[in-house]
Structures are given as C-alpha cells and as structure tokens.
A protein has these predicted regions:
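Structural and coupling elements of P-loop NTPases
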Residues: 1-608
C-alpha cells in the first residue's frame, strides 16, 4: 500500500475557481521557493487556456504536505473534453468537488461528478467563493446533497465532508464562520479522507496510459498511475491494447514525476505514483504499459463518441498563400494526425479526395480550439460546414446527439429564450425562480440546432444571460430544421472593396467587409435581408465628374463590421459554402467560386 501518496482530481464547473484554488494550494504548501516568481493560473499552461479561463488538457501537479505527496489532476470542465475527464478520473483515489457559493450546482458539475461517482470516488465538497456578497452556502449545500442522490451515490459517498473556502483569498474552514486563515485545513482533510489505493509493489510493473504529450526531445511521453510493481529507468517494457495485443516494445528510457508543476527525472517509480515515461513510440492512450511478462491489459473507461465533424482542405481561394506559412495538404495532414494521436477526443480520416481530411470531435468548442491553434501556427485552410454524426437504434431508426441546456436569465427574457429554443426543436424540462426576477430554464435540444446559438442567446438577453450546455445522450431524430434564412451577398470579381460601394450596399443587408479589404469572386461579403443569393460589386467607386463639390466625395459612413468567432461563422454556413481560415483573416465563401460552375453543380445535384 502506498500510504504516502494521495491522488486527487478537482471537479468543478467552468469558472468556479478550480485553477485558482490549485494555485494557492501549491503556494501555501511550500511547493515553490520563497524567492521564486510564480505565474498566476499555473495549471492553465496553454495560451488559449489562459485567454478563455478554461482547462482544455488535463495535467498533473504535486504537493508535499505532512510527509505525503498529494498528486493533483486538474480536469477539463467543458463537455467537449469529456474524453480527457474519463481518463483522468481513472488515476484518482479521491476528488475535490468545487462549487460556487452563489451559482450553485451547474451542468458541468453534474456531468463530471456522475463519472466520478460511477468510478467509486468519494468526493470532498468545497463550497468556494464564500467571499461573494450574494453567497448562499446553505442552499448550495442542500442542492449538492440532492445532486448526489439524483446521481445514485451510495451511502459512503453521500456522507461527504464539507469545507467552506475562498480559493482567491486562500483560506478554507469546516465552518462558514471559521477563522479563515489559510488552506491548511483542506490539505489536512485530503490526507485524512482520501484513502490510498491498495496496490501491490511486488507484482510486475503495469500502468494505464491516460495522457499523452508530444515532446520534441523525448518523443512520445505517456502519463499514468502505476497500478502495480515499480518502474525503473532502462528496464524492458511493452505496450498492449485493450484486447491484450502487443502494439510496441522497447526500453523505458526516461521516467519523471511531478514536483509542483515541473517534471523531475527519477530512477524508480512505485505503485500509486503518477509518472511520465518515455521510450515507446507507438503506444497510445488507453494502452497498458507494462513489464514484458504482463499479458492482461488494465481495463479502461469507454470514451464517449464524437458528435460532430468538419472537413478540412487546403486553402483554394485566390488569396491563398498571402497570409500564412503552412499551406500544403501534407502539412495539414501531418498536423491533424498529430492532434488525433495526442487527443483521443479527436478522430482523423482522409476523404476520397487526397487533399481533403475529416476531423470528428465532441462539439463546437473542441473543433474551434483545434482550428484556432492551427491558425496561430500559421496554417491556411478551407473548412466545410459542421455535420452532426448520427447513430441508429436496433430497429434502424436514426438517432442524433441531444444536449441538456441550462440558462439563467432575467424574467423578462425567458419567453424569448423559450421561443428561440422551440425553433431549434428544444423541449423545456424545468423552469424555476432563482432569485428576484431571475429564472433558470432547462431544455433538451438536438446538437445540430445549437451550432452558434451562444451568440444568439447573448443577443436575446442583451448580454446578461448565462448559458451552459452538456451532452445528454443520443435520442430520436427530431425532424428537419430550417437553415439560414438570409441569402448571401457574393462578390462578382477579385479586387478590393471600396467605401462608396459598401455604403450604397448597406441598405441591402449586413456587410462583412470594409474599405480596402481584399475580396474575390465567390466570396461572401454580406448577408441579404431575405432568402436568395445576390451577386454584387463591392469594388465600384464613385464616377468622376467635371463639377465636383469640395469635401463630399469621401463623406460616407460605414456600419462597423460585426466581429465573429470561428464557431459563429461555421454555424452560418449553408451546405454549398465554406470558411477560409488564415492567420490574419476569416472569410466566408461559396465552395464553388465561379457562378456558372455553381449553377451547373446545382442542376446536376452533385454533392460538394
């Protein structure tokens, strides 16, 4: 038994203070030297994670407290990264359930907690952000108990210990009105409540690979908890898949464990510890890394299937190559293969067309994160409209992914939200008061109706509403939905947009370009107010005359162009359209740029 090791995961809804809590736990436990400069948001290592305030990739860290090593695994808090969550929980012996003292139990809390309880973890409940003026700790504790009951928690799990805390201020206490001095009571409770796993150090080495990182120096680095035996540098090892088939064999060239957030090389890792090993180039997530004499794989949690796919190809617009550095199909393919290897929530396949690739993931955010990362790396590409991945039941009926949507809005907006969800085939499950003139509405709705809905929701609630979505499961196909009602305003030729032309076209619809923006034939430069595409000239300047009034030629006022994210633009696409992505620009376009070719294609009915 590894009595001096505790492996815990932190479960929390997005922005409930998880990463900040970990920051302060590490600082107060002495994980850093007194003179060491420490960044905020230590566990958010990616640029996008720090920008968006969400955890995308799970990552371990460790704290030494009272002669015990506490390995902390920060789990993603968003539904699209469920694949990460499931694997991370397999490394944990216990969990901290962090809940905002004002917002209370939220969808992501329910989603990850359900998986943790199913694996038999016994959480410590931490009511966080108690320094909020609108905190309602007692009500939130009651809601939490009700949530445990609804998730079929057993008696031991229902008898959870509770701490009241402020991660930002750096204190935790067993009582609401405790002394509020530091986080030491929480660290003590972790050691007391979380029981170390009973593991046998005498058996041959075996470890489930739960995370994978690409390292330019070490090659493939695999992270996992040693389930039995000890791992020693330079020992022969192999990887076997879930069927027990050998997929790789080699030597354990390097072994590391975490001290704080840093990897430190060690000679021996023992059962119960979370380590990083290198030496196998073909091993993957969910494989068992083990001694040569081990033949039984460690069971791995099934991973939820992807629900959405996009097609990515080389940038074929007339502006291709003017803004990016990575342009070829080979570069795109290699990048996507690497992503699929490192992120089991993403799957990769190649279309019949050699230069076209299909990427499937767990939702809009996962796909948007990938496209944003590639954009920052200098890629140019063309992306198709997202497609929902359907399944069939035993009778051959079509099933589609259904999401649970929880919204918190002012009462005056609730009818608008109900109406907008009805149009998306949403069904209202619950409506309740959450405070003065505040409502919480819960819906079930098909994923395909929710693409780009967040921006629409914020418009309907004038920026005051909060929306959360979670994958519920597959349900019966809810029937066809209306697509975009606005026709596209399409550029008739290549050139640069002119202010005079845009000014005169503004009355015909919303424009996506401004003065001097490059445009090309087939590029969507705006949306018409009614159905039906319209080809327009945005390069037409004012005719010169002999008699010119001084100061009037340039006196045009252009409506500012709406700034839209990748997800918003993808949600706008019809089946015959695409999105051009470059490091500097996002451009909507027709899949076939030439209008004559488009008409031929429409008549022939050839799929794009």
């Amino acid at each position: 038994m590894s009595n001096n090791i505790r492996n815990i995961t932190i479960i929390a809804h997005v922005d409930h203070g998880k990463t900040t809590m970990i920051d302060n736990l590490m600082k107060q436990s002495g994980s850093f030297r007194e003179n060491e400069v420490v960044d905020e948001r230590l566990m958010d290592s990616g640029e996008l994670e720090k920008e968006r305030g969400i955890t995308i990739l799970a990552k371990p860290a460790s704290i030494d407290w009272q002669n015990t090593r506490i390995n902390i695994i920060d789990t993603p808090g968003h539904r699209d990264f469920a694949a990460e969550v499931e694997r991370v929980l397999s490394m944990a012996d216990g969990a901290l359930l962090l809940i905002d003292s004002a917002e209370g139990v939220m969808p992501q809390t329910k989603f990850v907690l359900a998986k943790a309880l199913k694996q038999g973890l016994k959480p410590i409940v931490v009511i966080n952000k108690l320094d909020k003026t609108d905190q309602r700790a007692d009500e939130v504790l009651d809601e939490t108990f009700d949530l445990f009951v609804s998730l079929d928690a057993n008696e031991e799990q229902l008898d959870f210990p509770v701490m009241y805390a402020s991660g930002r201020s750096g204190w935790a206490d067993k009582e609401v009105d405790g002394p509020r001095e530091n986080l030491h009571p929480l660290l003590d409770l972790i050691i007391e409540h979380v029981k170390p796993a009973e593991l046998d150090k005498t058996k041959p080495f075996a470890m489930l690979s739960t995370l994978l990182y690409a390292d330019s120096f070490l090659g493939r680095s695999l992270v996992g908890k040693i389930s039995q035996g000890t791992a020693k540098a330079n020992q022969p090892i192999k990887a076997i898949n879930l069927k027990g088939e050998k997929v790789d064999e080699g030597r354990l060239t390097k072994i590391f464990r975490y001290e704080g957030t840093k990897k430190v090389p060690i000679e021996v890792g023992e059962a119960g510890d979370i380590v990083v090993i290198a030496g196998l180039e073909k091993a993957n997530v969910a494989d068992t890394i083990c001694d040569l004499e081990v033949n039984e794989p460690i069971p791995a949690t099934p991973i939820d299937p992807p629900t959405m796919s996009i097609t990515i190809s080389v940038n074929s617009s007339p502006l291709a190559g003017t803004e990016g550095k990575k342009l070829t199909s080979t570069q795109i393919r290699d990048r996507l293969i690497t992503e699929a290897q490192n992120n089991v929530g993403i799957s990769f396949s190649q279309n019949e067309n050699v230069d076209t690739f299909i990427i499937s993931g767990r939702g809009e955010l996962m796909l948007e994160i990938l496209l944003t990362q590639m954009r920052r790396e200098g890629f140019e590409m063309t992306v198709s409209p997202p497609k929902v991945l359907y399944q069939k039941d035993d009778n051959g009926n079509r099933l589609e992914p259904i999401e649970e949507i929880t919204v918190d809005v002012d009462e005056e907006f609730s009818s608008k939200i109900i109406d907008s969800m009805n149009r998306r085939k949403g069904k209202l499950l619950d409506l309740k008061d959450t405070g003065k003139d505040k409502k919480r509405l819960i819906f079930h709705a098909p994923t395909r109706g929710l693409m780009g809905y967040t921006s629409r929701f914020l418009t309907l609630t004038k920026g005051t509403g909060v929306i959360n979505r979670i994958f519920h499961g597959y349900g019966k196909f809810e029937g066809e939905m209306d697509g975009r009602k606005n026709g596209a305003l399409i550029s008739m030729a290549n050139g640069k947009a002119v202010a005079f032309a845009i000014f005169n076209l503004q009355a015909r619809g919303e424009m996506f370009v401004t003065h001097n923006d490059p445009v090309y034939e087939g590029m969507i430069v705006g949306l018409a107010p009614k159905p039906g595409d319209m080809i327009i000239n945005v390069m037409k300047g004012k005719q010169l005359t002999n008699m010119r009034t001084q100061g009037t030629d340039e006196n045009v006022v252009l409506t500012p162009v709406r700034q839209m994210s990748i997800a918003e633009q993808l949600s706008m696409l019809n089946t015959d359209e695409a999105l051009e992505i470059t490091p500097k620009s996002l451009r909507l376009r027709k899949a076939i740029l030439n209008p004559t070719e488009r008409k031929k294609n429409e008549k022939s009915g050839t799929p794009l």
